[in-house]
């Protein structure tokens, strides 16, 4: 019985989870002129901006998203990149993420970058 308690203690603390924020960012690839953000341009942006903010890593998933263009009055579907990152709550990181969105919109002439933040428990 003594060993069962020790085993439970080790398992509990080695698998402990921490409270974090999961941030999902959706970067559309279509430009207003009909051209697309190229893979090279995306990789340059990722290395120059995203990797500097998410120094501990992130995941990138190719997705296809839809959004309503209120000026054209129609639903737009486009290829996008979804970036997922888990981080501790911090106003500094939040401002850096806002900056990522700002620069992507400015560089690639985007109306918006969707940002979704949610509280999660993560175990590494």
Please name every model-derived segment.
Residues 41-55:
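Short amphipathic alpha-helical segments
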Residues 53-82:
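Short, intrinsically disordered low-complexity segments
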Residues 75-124:
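Helix-rich interaction surfaces within compact, conserved domain-sized segments
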Residues 36, 40-44, 91-95:
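Soluble non-cytosolic domains of exported or imported proteins
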Residues 18-22, 78-80:
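A general secondary-structure signal for short beta-strands and their flanking turns/coil
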Residues 20-39:
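Terminal, regulation- and interaction-focused segments at domain boundaries
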Residues 4-12:
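Sec-dependent N-terminal signal peptides
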């Amino acid at each position: 019985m003594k060993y069962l308690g020790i085993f439970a203690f080790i398992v509990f603390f080695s698998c402990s989870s921490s409270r974090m924020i999961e941030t999902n960012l959706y970067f559309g690839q279509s430009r207003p002129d009909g051209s697309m953000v190229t893979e090279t341009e995306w990789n340059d942006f990722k290395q120059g901006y995203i990797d500097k903010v998410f120094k501990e890593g992130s995941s990138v998933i190719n997705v296809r998203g839809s959004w309503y263009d209120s000026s054209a009055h129609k639903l737009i579907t486009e290829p996008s990149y979804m970036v997922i990152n888990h981080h501790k709550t911090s106003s500094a990181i939040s401002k850096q993420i806002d900056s990522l969105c700002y620069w992507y919109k400015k560089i690639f002439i985007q109306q918006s970058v969707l940002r979704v933040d949610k509280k999660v428990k993560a175990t590494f």
